[in-house]
A protein has these predicted regions:
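C-terminal motif of bacterial Sec signal peptides marking the signal peptidase cleavage site
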Residues: 5-8
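Beta-strand-rich domains and repeat architectures in extracellular enzymes and scaffolds
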Residues: 40-67, 91
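Repeated scaffold domains used in trafficking and secretory/extracellular systems
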Residues: 46-54, 87-99, 155-165, 195-205, ...
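Bacterial signal peptide processing site
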Residues: 10-13
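Short loop/turn segments that connect beta-strands within beta-propeller blades
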Residues: 74-77, 116-119, 183-186, 226-230, ...
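A short beta-strand motif characteristic of beta-propeller blades
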Residues: 32-46, 78-86, 145-153, 186-193, ...
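Short coil/turn segments that connect the beta-strands within blades of beta-propeller domains
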Residues: 57-59, 99-101, 167-168, 209-210, ...
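Blade-level signature of beta-propeller repeat domains, shared across WD40, Kelch, NHL, RCC1
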Residues: 328-354
Length: 354
């Protein structure tokens, strides 16, 4: 079933006024850092420099840098003792599955999982004793403990976006195919969609199936996948240029509109709908849901800021802004309210405790 774009008829005069830059959003380059970053700045081990993404399940954090994923707590991060898991650099973004305590990645030969329990290997290997970059007795940088990813589902085509739902269903898409495969109980169902999938999330819902969303940056759309009947949902345009998407609370999705300088809150039951949009002072890329405060955090790369928003009945309200490290393209909010931000071009992770 093909999704239907939900949009009103646009008169030619309005269509002509649409910006040529619509779609294909990328992070706006950061200026040189002038102001001291807020909170604590932690240097990463060399193999985890230039972070491409962050995610978390509870207090366990996943730090991705190309072909390596570091897993552990903030304390292990501070001590330079994250457990490293090698992955194919061609694997897509990490998604979190709290129900099974594993981080999920779509890769060229299938969908892989990284259990949060691999963080225990740091203690098994001697605990959090060596700081990042500290030399071992032999004069070489101390080696980080390692673990291996687990193949959850072999696929006959490369996967670049994958999620595993609370009930155990696996949804697998690709940035160069117009379909999403669903794996359940050894059977595969293929859903036709209108555009390839650049990113996908599954958001738990109490007492029901997860809400699954996907985005395409070229056409700047967001679409829900009907989990119960394994079909494509409706499609909505995300402003002028969707950047990233992240889970919120109870089936909610949060998406940044990088070109339009705003973020949207999306909900779905039978059909996806836009709940509200909130303008941002800078150009947003990374976005995170703060479950403790029931608030939204957004990183704006063009001014090196991390902003906190309160959602209301209308549009959200900016509460405060923190100075960030350069090129903050990854952002998470932990259960205790701690905020982690990572640079895509540097070697640092920023820890903010509001």
């Amino acid at each position: 079933m093909m999704g239907v774009v939900l949009t009103a008829c646009t008169p030619p005069s309005v269509q002509e006024k649409l910006p040529a830059a619509m779609g294909n959003a990328t992070p706006v380059p950061s200026p040189a850092m002038v102001d001291e970053p807020a909170g604590e700045v932690i240097s990463l081990p060399e193999q985890l420099a230039k972070v491409t993404e962050l995610d978390h399940i509870g207090e366990i954090v996943a730090v991705r840098a190309g072909a390596v994923v570091g897993v552990g707590t903030v304390d292990q991060l501070r001590a330079g003792r994250l457990v490293t898991v090698p992955v194919d650099a061609a694997c897509g973004d990490i998604s979190a599955t709290p129900a099974s305590n594993e981080f999920v990645l779509g890769c060229p030969d299938g969908v892989y999982g990284i259990p949060t329990s691999v963080a225990d290997a740091a203690d098994d290997a001697g605990g959090a004793g060596d700081a990042a970059g500290e030399e071992s007795d032999g004069g070489k940088p101390a080696e980080l403990p390692t673990a291996e990813p687990v193949l959850l589902q072999a696929t006959d085509q490369p996967v670049t976006a994958a999620v595993k739902t609370t009930s155990g269903m696996i949804f697998a898409g690709s940035s160069d195919r117009e379909d999403v495969d669903v794996y359940q109980d050894g059977e595969k169902t293929t859903i036709r969609v209108e555009d390839p999938t650049d990113a996908m999330i599954a958001v738990p819902v109490s007492g029901g199936e997860d809400s699954v969303y996907r985005i395409n940056r070229r056409t700047t759309i967001i679409q829900n996948i009907n989990v119960a009947d394994k079909s494509a949902g409706a499609v909505l345009r995300v402003g002028l240029g969707v950047g990233t998407i992240t889970p919120g609370a109870q089936g909610m999705a949060l998406a940044t509109d990088t070109i339009g300088k705003q973020f949207g809150v999306y909900l779905t039951n039978d059909v996806i709908r836009l709940h509200q949009t909130t303008p941002t002072t800078g150009a947003p890329w990374a976005i995170a849901w703060d479950d403790k405060r029931q608030q939204v955090w957004v990183a704006t790369t063009d001014d090196n800021k991390i902003r906190r928003y309160q959602l209301g009945s209308g549009q959200g309200e900016e509460l405060e802004a923190y100075n960030s490290i350069e090129n903050t393209q990854s952002l998470v909010a932990l259960p205790d309210g701690t905020i982690l931000a990572a640079s895509a071009t540097g070697t640092d992770v920023q820890v903010i405790t509001p």
